[in-house]
């Protein structure tokens, strides 16, 4: 892909139609279902995409289908993202499926021990949901807070249950 070119690809998931924006640097954003994503052209066998783009889409679909998947292989296009948010997203990507961290844990891990609220703000504007697994970040004492995906906190809780996160058990992400 040439410098500054981008590709937007929509695909169907259990949550609805999601989309990714991909550039020469990698994944630039993930869009969770909305009226706007429903109108985009869908991924098909006829659409020419790289193996990395296809693997990223397959990984996101797998996670939203209830399959535990590790998406740390996905290259991120972080141009325009400030160093603090980059650090938050990098730290969040280290949280493996089945694990959780608090906003305070992330803040301490990036050298900002009093920055839990700033971490929360950074994750609230996470342009890479699912790939940067903000659903694995919880409030102090494991309290569920903020999640912008359809279904909000209930979806966050189901995703954590599916992954077997401590205190959340395991359960099917979406029932029939």
Language-model segments: residues:
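…primarily DNA-binding HTH/wHTH and HhH modules…
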Residues: 140-176
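Short glycine/serine-rich loop segments
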Residues: 114-155
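Active-site phosphate/pyrophosphate-handling residues
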Residues: 87, 129, 158
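Basic nucleic-acid-binding alpha-helical/helix-turn surface characteristic of O6-alkylguanine DNA
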Residues: 1-114, 162-176
